[in-house]
């Protein structure tokens, strides 16, 4: 278990804490339009000590190590970048000094525990920001300070939409830069970049692109993803469709992180086990859209005999045609078939008045919602 250590610096808003944002230079936050405070030496020292103390707390709490964030939303990246670091003192003349100092002092504080770095290797702002070529030179300098691994990410204050893109962006967009960084380092490098399909993750590792792959959203959609991969049961992995509807976590209100395709995710401590085996009943489900398929899947897993009635000639409802939704409903349909669920297509609602079932679930009539 690795604790993530972060300070967002000049990115964000003072609306909640009512204190000025801190940053290397007074570069406006393009989203909140706030101008941050230029960090004085005492401020710099305080933040460095904060990272050190946080690392100590993480280790004393049982974590195996700490990961320092120099990614898209981080103060550490802001010191590394010419976009946001315009200082003429030591912290600006050597833009790596802040990051190197934090890594070295954290290493002194936690000894042999694991230390990782999350590094933005492309700020997508070539006029002044960190570019892939710069990152290839930068990574070895930072690794030499005592890193055990490095995670390649991308983005900056000027490219927030690229931080955690949805399905409009191709999967594995950081593959090329990750491989370049891996080639110049002798520590493990991890690939991050909207990879949600197991075969893509395995391919990246097998081809030597990286030592491992981050699959955060994929594991929100299916918390058992790793276990299913180890058991060679990939077909049963509930697919993440990268819709970004309920899994976004950068929210000061601290909402529950859950998932559109797996609504029980995030509610494990309060919801019952929906798949507990019970006395078998005959269950009829009217409608084979996402709701009907999920109801049929859940009922079948609980041991019921399930039959689904759908007016159209295929399952999935409107979701089958909406963006990446077809991927999910196709998976759900295949899982239902594998569980023995019987489907009856071309059956109108009027024809489902006498089904002879113990339980009838009406799952028709979807309504449009605001994303």
Where are the regions that the model predicts?
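C-terminal structured "cap/appendage" subdomains that terminate the fold
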Residues: 202-213, 220, 314, 320, ...
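A broadly tuned "polar low-complexity/structure-edge" signature
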Residues: 261-264, 334, 343
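Generic structural signal for residues in well-ordered beta-strands
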Residues: 189, 306, 343-345
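FAD-binding core/adjacent interface of flavoenzyme oxidoreductases
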Residues: 243-251, 339-371
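Beta1-alpha1 glycine-rich phosphate/pyrophosphate-binding loop at the start
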Residues: 285-339
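Exposed boundary/loop context
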Residues: 209, 309-310, 358
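Flavin-dependent oxidoreductase catalytic cores
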Residues: 1-286, 290, 294-301, 367-371
